[in-house]
Amino acid sequence: MEKLEKRYGLPTAICMVVGTVIGSGVFFKAQNVLAATGGDMPLGILAWIITGVLMILCSLQFASMAQKYQKVSGVVDYAEVTCGKGYAYYLAWFLVNIYYPGMTSVLAWVSARYFGVLFGWDLAGPEVLCLAGFTLVASYTLNAFSPKLAGKFQISATVIKLIPIVLMAIVGTVAGLKSGVLTSNFTTVVSEAVGGKSGGLFAAVVATVFAYEGWIVATSINAELKNPKTNLPIALIIGSIIVVVAYVFYYIGVAGGATNAVLIEEGATTAFTNIFGTIGGTFLNICIVISCLGTLNGLMVGATRGMYAISSRGEGPRPEMFNQVDKSTNMVTNSSIWGLFVCSAWLLYFYGANLTSGWFGYFNFDSSELPIVTIYGLYIPIFIIWMIKEKELGFVKRFLLPVLALAACGFMVFAAIYAHGITPYLNAKANGEFSCPVLFYLIIFAVIMLVGAFVKKPKKK
């Protein structure tokens, strides 16, 4: 089997974590958090911090595992050394055919959507859909033809996307304190949160889960990272902390640009326009486009390397084909082609399920969030077996970190089930109807995993 070149350093790995997480979520989820808490600023900040802490807890556990294990694809390797080759295969199959392409396809559409805002396009129209397809192919092309250039773009996109966040955090806070808007937003609420403060907090945390998702994608470059045992743990921890700090201060800065009532109705663009003028509003949309493209690039890195991770273990369909590395670009070309195909299929599904009247009936679900139901659930056996097997480790690494990570995973899974299962079911039941997106997502998940079981081992000659 051909080996991948060690080409990425610590800055790229940190940018992969920051760039993959800080995407569309930080800009439009702030509005959702305000709505969930009824405009209660301190409660909203607490929600951002809670979810951020959960992400850091999982990062710490994976950082601990990265210090001991490394092979090809990060989290898949951790699954193999803890739960065995069989479990690692199914985790990799899930990542390749559901998680990476589902998230990547949505980010392609979101990138096109915010670009379309600049020209007044219909957000569900053919222009945005065509542009989404183009951005998907463009990201694939960048990663397939020049992985090093893709890494440099990741660094550039991370720096650019932090500019509006930093500006809003500083200028928005100062302007808000000067005008009194920020003080007013902190001391008053627009309305009582549904279910009281506890219900509002839980709903807000659910809203922030998507904004924090994606950090684990950085582990997909484990085999291409220089000194991975040291650099990957550092990248996961530093990157996660940067994300939490950026989200909290951006959220505060936005509140300095408009009242909570206005922000709930119109979103963060109004705050940028109030502080920086019309040009500032346009600048925000441009930065959002760059932010989403950076996130798309980070997810495409994982999507294009997925089948390589499976075939490198001699499993899956045609392993001898998918583990080939192009000699001129040092890229896993055949694996990349499969990644693009599956991403395109999920883009078609996302459009039909979420941007039209619904092509799939009960099987319409949000492919941007529901993979969380399984990705965190699939981490749980890894952490449990780690505690059982790693007897030579001290108390902190063997028990404390994995237990905290298990609690974080359990919360994430329950939050996703609550938001996409319990709530829509109760709302539909009140109207004499039935709706449970998470149930039908899990059916699709089961079918895809059964296909994976069918092609698990190559046929013997």
Where are these regions (language model features)?
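A generic transmembrane alpha-helix motif of multi-pass inner-membrane proteins
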Residues: 176-177, 365-384, 388, 395-461
